[in-house]
A protein has these predicted regions:
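Active-site beta-loop-alpha junctions enriched in small/polar residues
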Residues: 10-14, 39-41, 70-74, 94-96, ...
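Conserved, mostly hydrophobic/aromatic
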Residues: 19, 26, 37, 81, ...
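N-terminal amphipathic alpha-helix/helix-capping segment at the start of soluble metabolic enzymes
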Residues: 1-13, 20-21
Length: 216
């Protein structure tokens, strides 16, 4: 079941000196969403952008913003990203804190709440939180760096998480998504495909977007 697979452009792989133009180019190429990788230099070693960048880009497009928070203190920051204009906010299940309150706070702030999990995290980590989730963000590469390859066990993980979440909750798949891996991610239950290098590294972004969509 594809139920209208969506393509999210990860601007981590765009020209960071021209993010407004990158968002506009992605919209013109036909993507459905903009994916924002928020890194704090603590939960992951890299450091990217914060709320001020989200607010600046919010005026560039009406496309939904998906915030992927790779940060050590999501309880403090997650509701603020929702308030800044993100339609979805995902926090990492690996962060050692109680997640249900943060997920509920994201919803109260007006966004959909999600849990993200790295490849080494078992699917059962989602089980205790399903009632508080709108979606799962399944990482098919290690969080913190763009341009990695889709991991061999990705299909099995997506399928297992789909069974845990049931049919009604969405699964976003992030990492190594390109024309050669997109169909596999969708076949196992992915609803939103997050792509960066495959889009911003393409000669023709519109063709790259269409290359990720399921074929009729």
């Amino acid at each position: 079941m594809t139920r209208g697979v969506q393509i999210a452009a990860s601007i981590l792989n765009a020209d960071l000196g021209a993010l407004r133009e990158a968002v506009q180019a992605a919209e013109q190429a036909g993507v459905d969403r903009i994916h924002l990788d928020i890194m704090d230099g603590h939960f992951v070693p890299n450091l990217t952008f914060g709320i001020a960048t989200v607010e600046a880009l919010r005026g560039v497009t009406s496309l939904p913003f998906d915030a992927h928070l790779m940060i050590a203190n999501p309880a403090l920051w997650a509701p603020r990203y929702a308030a800044a204009g993100c339609q979805t906010v995902a926090i990492h299940v690996e962060v050692p804190e109680r997640h249900q309150g943060t997920l509920d706070a994201i919803r109260t702030a007006g966004a959909q709440a999600g849990l993200a999990a790295d490849p080494g995290t078992p699917a059962r980590a989602f089980a205790a939180h399903v009632a508080h989730l709108d979606f799962a963000l399944v990482m098919t590469v290690k969080s913190g760096f763009g341009g990695q390859s889709y991991q061999p066990d990705a299909a099995a993980r997506i399928k297992e998480i789909r069974v845990l979440l049931g049919a009604e909750r969405l699964i976003h798949v992030d990492g190594g998504i390109r024309s050669s891996t997109a169909a596999d991610a969708v076949a196992q239950g992915g609803d939103v495909l997050v792509a960066g290098t495959a889009l911003f590294g393409a000669a023709q972004m519109r063709a790259a977007v269409e290359g990720l969509r399921p074929k009729a």
